[in-house]
């Protein structure tokens, strides 16, 4: 008879302990251990693949340049690095209602319409509910198969029986293995189901996408090892009330990371935004103080976006600082640079900094744009509307060079910008001919003289 024992798992990293601990010794997080009942059976997750296990000389290993499977959605193909790799396991995470299932249904439709067999496995909806949602997207071919199940063994058998080229698991937190006594969505269940799906994908050369729920902190629910096990991790960002959605690749074994795809949620599903820069700048106010346009590199794609700042005298004892779409601590740091190195009296002012369009950016190249937006609002002097700004700012007020200067300038020139304020070091590196007026600055003081 199988024996049951009580173990404790860290919900962040999956570390296992025989007793509860306040702090995880592996990831150093506090209050993350959860209790689970585990049946002592043969260990799963370590089964060998069908390929030979004998060591080989690396020079004898042949690499086949297999053609990727195009999804029919160019923005998704860009994030994946050119399409879906056969035998890969990908994780799609995001807030509820953000559009994860809608996007994967659209991928299934495109693949089925191109005569590729597709299996959509749902543990959250009935076939009738999926059909209702699918009709909003469009017509589906016979190659699209639906299966509503949560048992791991039944799901594995269905995949091996139908042998699809592409399979979707929606969602990983609803699936369970009968070999474990813990509930679906627990650390051990998520880890076991993911390991089983990885074996199925690799052994049968099937591309598998799994949908993952996120916690209130914005990370995929379950152990951190989940993201280490899969080949690709994609995150859907954006507010449910906003029109635009950002698909960001944070891990990709077959392409570059930090690539983004931009979508707009419409009545018939997600629609690609082919020119995000132009879309993000629509409706931008002209001749307004506190408004600047910056260029940020998201992966290999330059994106132009507006930063707005509002600085006004405070009526509170402690001035308010608010940042939307930009790191709050970074804004405070840059305001300290303005006070110390430039002499702006911001200690008695409220400051609000907003990134238009619902985007989130963390690249240091937008530092100079943030500083100029704050100074423009403080002095109530607008920056010329045909000006683009980028550059990293240090604590002593210097403006440092950033990568991708030529790509940023080309993107700005396409959209009709005439002037670019950038680090002097970048001006010296640019070799391409451009009609834009390049204004190089070495420190914050030189930049603010241009307002």
Please tell me what each predicted stretch does.
Residues 2-12, 16-78, 85-93, 98-109, ...:
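Peripheral, non-AAA+ core regions of ATP-driven protein-machinery
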Residues 123-129:
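Conserved Walker A/P-loop ATP-binding site and its immediately adjacent core
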């Amino acid at each position: 008879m199988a024996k049951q024992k009580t173990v404790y798992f860290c919900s962040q990293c999956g570390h296992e302990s025989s007793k509860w601990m306040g702090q995880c010794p592996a990831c150093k997080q506090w209050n993350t251990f959860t209790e689970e009942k585990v049946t002592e059976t043969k260990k799963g997750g370590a089964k060998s693949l069908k390929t030979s296990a004998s060591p080989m000389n690396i020079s004898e290993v042949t690499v086949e340049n297999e053609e990727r499977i195009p999804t029919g959605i160019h923005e998704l193909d860009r994030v994946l690095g050119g399409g879906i790799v056969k035998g890969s396991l990908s994780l799609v995470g995001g807030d509820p209602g953000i559009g994860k299932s809608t996007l994967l249904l659209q991928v299934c439709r495109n693949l089925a319409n191109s005569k590729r067999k597709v299996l959509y496995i749902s543990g959250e909806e009935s076939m009738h509910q999926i059909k209702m949602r699918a009709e909003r997207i469009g017509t589906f071919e016979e190659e699209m198969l639906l299966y509503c199940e949560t048992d791991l063994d039944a799901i594995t058998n269905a995949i091996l029986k139908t042998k699809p080229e592409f399979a979707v698991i929606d969602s990983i937190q609803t699936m369970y293995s009968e070999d474990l006594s813990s509930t679906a969505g627990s650390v051990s269940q998520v880890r076991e189901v993911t390991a089983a799906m990885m074996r199925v994908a690799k052994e049968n050369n099937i591309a598998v996408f799994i949908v993952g729920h996120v916690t209130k902190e914005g990370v995929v629910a379950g152990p951190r090892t989940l993201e280490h096990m899969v080949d690709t991790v994609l995150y859907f960002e954006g507010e449910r009330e906003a029109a635009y959605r950002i698909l960001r690749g944070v891990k990709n074994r077959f392409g570059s990371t930090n690539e983004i795809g931009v979508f707009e949620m419409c009545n018939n599903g997600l629609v690609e935004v082919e020119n995000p820069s132009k879309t993000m700048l629509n409706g931008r106010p002209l001749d307004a103080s506190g408004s600047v346009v910056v260029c940020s590199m998201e992966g290999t794609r330059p994106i132009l976006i507006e930063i707005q700042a509002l600085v006004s005298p405070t009526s509170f004892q402690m001035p308010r600082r608010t940042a939307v779409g930009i790191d709050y601590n970074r804004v405070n740091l840059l305001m300290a640079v303005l006070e110390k190195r430039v002499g702006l009296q911001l200690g008695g002012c409220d400051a609000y900094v907003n990134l238009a369009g619902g985007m989130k950016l963390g690249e240091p190249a937008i530092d100079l744009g943030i500083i100029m937006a704050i100074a423009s609002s403080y002095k109530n002097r607008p920056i010329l509307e045909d000006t683009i700004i980028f550059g990293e700012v240090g604590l002593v007020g210097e403006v440092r060079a950033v990568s991708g200067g030529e790509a940023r300038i080309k993107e700005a020139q396409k959209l009709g910008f005439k002037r670019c304020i950038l680090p002097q070091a970048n001006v010296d590196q640019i070799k391409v001919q451009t009609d834009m007026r390049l204004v190089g600055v070495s420190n914050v003081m030189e930049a603010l003289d241009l307002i």
